[in-house]
Amino acid sequence: MNNTQDKKKPEEIHNLHYYIDHIRYDMTNLIKWLVLAVLTGLSVGFISSLFARVLKFVTNYRTEHFWVFFLLPVSGLIIVFLYQKFGQEDGGTNQVLSTIRSQDDVPFRSAPLIFVSTILTHFAGGSAGREGAAIQLGGSIGNQLGSWFHLDEEDRHVMVMCGMSAAFSAVFGTPMAAAVFSMEVVSVGIMYYAALVPCVIASIIASKFAAGFGINPESFHVVNIPELTIETGLKMVLVAIACAAISIIFCMALQGVSKLYAKFLKNPYIRIVAASAIIIVITLFLRTSDYMGAGNNLIELAVENGQARPLDFFWKLVLTALTMRAGFRGGEIVPSFCIGATFGCIMEHLIGLSPSICAAAGMAALFCGVTNCPITSILIAFELFGFRGASYYLIAVSISYAVSGYYGLYKDQTIVYSKYKAKYINRHTRF
């Protein structure tokens, strides 16, 4: 009996050492990622906050001085020159996404390039967003931090996602959505949970840093939210289906304009000048500056006041496609918010549901349609609009995700699992 007990003791001690070693490894790994996440959140938070402040300044200046809009061709020429000179291989957000699945790096020069070029685009009134630029900015900085700390390839991929989340959170003030977005957008159908802790921590720190820097988080007050019934639920399904259709049209418009530019305007300098002239003519014809920049003013009117002109969504879609595919920089995410909010708002005239809730749900639904990120879309709706209309947002996002098919803003986004059955398909989005 004593011999048996004596034999068990070394085995128990061995098992104890085994578990202690694993706990030590896990704790070391956790501490490593906490430190890296804090550093990423602070560094990306600072750069992104500075980016947001400068962006706000140039936007306000352009709003007060309409003549700046006529400098759009000049801004475009500067942007083309910068990318021809320093960043010919820069692939924008697509390059950041492909980096996470490959051995490639995000060039550090992407950070100053996207910073300056987005500022120039917004200064002159191009129809572009800012989150796309922030994602590239954060991904570039995150990758560079990973290189400085001599991290291996897999860890650098996590650092890219960490930087993306931090930048998105700092610029838009939605840490929950930002933390999930970078893990969800790369491969639809799977989540990179290895990045959960660093993305969450970096996102929160960057958001708080930005708030201390004077960057107020975006939020909108949704009014007149009706009780969810079978009737109102079915009406929201119609809104979601319509927004999914518009999301497909938006993606097709971006691709179509890109092909037209490539066919008829091969020289990038001529292309951006010609596109600027077209944008200026359309804007003067419409006699409004509402479609310049990201479109926050139209979102606010649609969501909080239930006001949108019948063709607001159309002109924002057209001008964004003309701007972004000409070579201007910024991103399509906030314009997609604007298109969804204004289109959802006018759906009220067809279905008789509150224009405010239609605008809010339409914004989330269209964002989901173009990014294929339903969890992020739900979270961003909660953070921007609160939880009172949660049921409507859930309906809108889920229906839009299913109906929008395999279209998307990013050609390097991979659809790993089918949207319609538990089936591995591993295909790229239709772009």
Regions found by a protein language model. Name each.
Residues 1-431:
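Alpha-helical transmembrane segments and immediately membrane-proximal extracytoplasmic
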